Amino acid sequence: MNEKYNVYLVSDSTGETLDRIFLSLKSQFANFDYEKKEYAFVRTEQQIDKIIKECSKLQNSIILYTIVETKLAKYISKQSEKNKVPCFGILGNLILSFSKLLNQKAIHKPSAQHVLDDDYYKRIEAIQFTMSHDDGKKTEDINQADIILLGVSRTSKTPTSIYLANRGYKTLNIPLVLDHKIPQILKENFSKFCVIGLVADPERLSEIRRTRASVNQSIDLKAYTDVEAIKVEVENSKKMFKQYGWPTIDVTRRSVEETAASIIKIFEIKKNK
């Protein structure tokens, strides 16, 4: 039986960065039984003392932290060592290395990444655009989109679009269904836009569609989930993507993050041509 670990995520900001890092870290270990506790906006020694006190009472405690203020980072490290609690700073060495490389002193300011700068407003604008141009809506605004996603039903168009929007890309997605034709402007200017086709394994699509149909009773279950019919849908979409020279991504075994990363790479290559 595997031991259970108590993982403490301690951050001087929202903790979002640390949580993402931990998710990536834990995915590398198949047999990792843990209970996670998160502490955000930790900016005093008193807060750290309270966390260390709790950690030291439990077996198998581990602290991961992102604290950019040098004095406080040293304090949590010292107190953890004193109480024999394994403690790992995520940003410390990285900030130091960058400081040396750039030949400038780091500001060591918590939440510096959350300053309302141009990038922030760009993301907000992208999110608003993407939400109002989901599932084939307002295709007349296609010239305003950074990225256009095409695909048959349940190929992760919407979640991928939202993820891209959070990265600052105005994304418009269009479902490839019989009663929804793609805009003529795409066909006439197929190389002008950054269009990406999403495809998936028909059997996997059938499973996902069955789940959706069980929630939405108005859907024709047989027509919507028939594997042979889906094979035709996917094959037709592939032919269209090939006809217009649009890059295709198979999302069957990809997470939304992986799909989005590939899309961003395609976008950057096209932009820099």
Question: Over which residues does each language-model region extend?
Answer:
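N-terminal accessory targeting/assembly segments
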Residues: 1-21, 25
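Short beta->alpha junction loops
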Residues: 36-46, 176-178, 253
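Metallocofactor- and cofactor-centric catalytic cores in central/energy metabolism, strongly enriched
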Residues: 38-57, 63-67
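Ser/Thr/Gly-rich flexible loops in soluble cytosolic domains mediating phosphotransfer, phosphorylation
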Residues: 81-125, 226-232, 239
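Internal active-site segments that recognize and position negatively charged phosphoryl groups
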Residues: 124-170
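Small-molecule kinase domains that catalyze NTP-dependent phosphoryl transfer to phosphate-bearing small molecules
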Residues: 130-137, 211, 218-259
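Short beta-strand-centered segment that lines the nucleotide-binding/catalytic pocket of NTP-utilizing
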Residues: 171-182
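Conserved phosphate-donor/acceptor-positioning beta-strand/loop module used by diverse small-molecule
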Residues: 191-210
